[in-house]
Amino acid sequence: MATQNGGPTQNAAPSLNVLAQYIKDFSFENPNAPRSLAAPPSQPDVNIQIHVNARPGGNGEFEVELKIDGGASIEGNTLFAFELVYAGVFRILNVPEESLQPVALIECPRLLFPFARQIIADAVRNGGFPPLMIDPVDFAALFQQRMQQEGQRIQA
C-alpha cells in the first residue's frame, strides 16, 4: 500500500527478497594428487573460515558476499584447499535503519549458505575425496563477534 505521494506507508511490512545469487570467485586445489587420494593413515585436520561482507547498492539493494576458505591436511601435507566467494543481491525494504546491518549480515548469508555448502561439497567430492559437509553456521554469533571486534578497534 502506498501513500498519495507514492511512498510506502508507515505500516508496510518488512521484506527481504533475493534478486540474484552467484559464484563470484571459486578455486579448488588438490596439490598432491594422486598421492593425496590414498586412504589417509589418520583423520585429516579440516580448517574452515567464514567471512561475510555487505555493500549497499541503492534502492534498498545490497550485495552480500559469503566467503568460505578452507582445506584439509594430514601431518602438514595439504590434501585439498578451497576458496569460495558466493554472493547474492538482496532487496531489503521497510526495515528500520538500525536493523539493516543485522539483516544484511545475518539473514542474507543464512539464505546463501546452503548453496555455498553444496558447491564446496561437490568440488571436494569431484576432487576425489568424500564430500565435505560443513556444519551449519550461527551467523548471529558471527555478527556479534564482528561487532565486538569493531568496538575493541574503536576503543584502541
Curated annotation (Swiss-Prot):
GO terms for molecular function: unfolded protein binding. InterPro entries: SecB, SecB-like_sf. The keyword Transport applies. Coiled coil: none annotated. It comes from the Bacteria. One of its GO terms (cellular component) is cytoplasm. The keyword Chaperone applies. It is found in: Cytoplasm. It holds the Pfam family SecB. Its main location: cytoplasm. GO terms for biological process: protein folding; protein tetramerization; protein transport. One of the proteins required for the normal export of preproteins out of the cell cytoplasm. It is a molecular chaperone that binds to a subset of precursor proteins, maintaining them in a translocation-competent state. It also specifically binds to its receptor SecA. PANTHER family: PROTEIN-EXPORT PROTEIN SECB, PTHR36918. Homotetramer, a dimer of dimers. One homotetramer interacts with 1 SecA dimer. This is Protein-export protein SecB. It comes from Xanthobacter autotrophicus (strain ATCC BAA-1158 / Py2). The gene is secB.
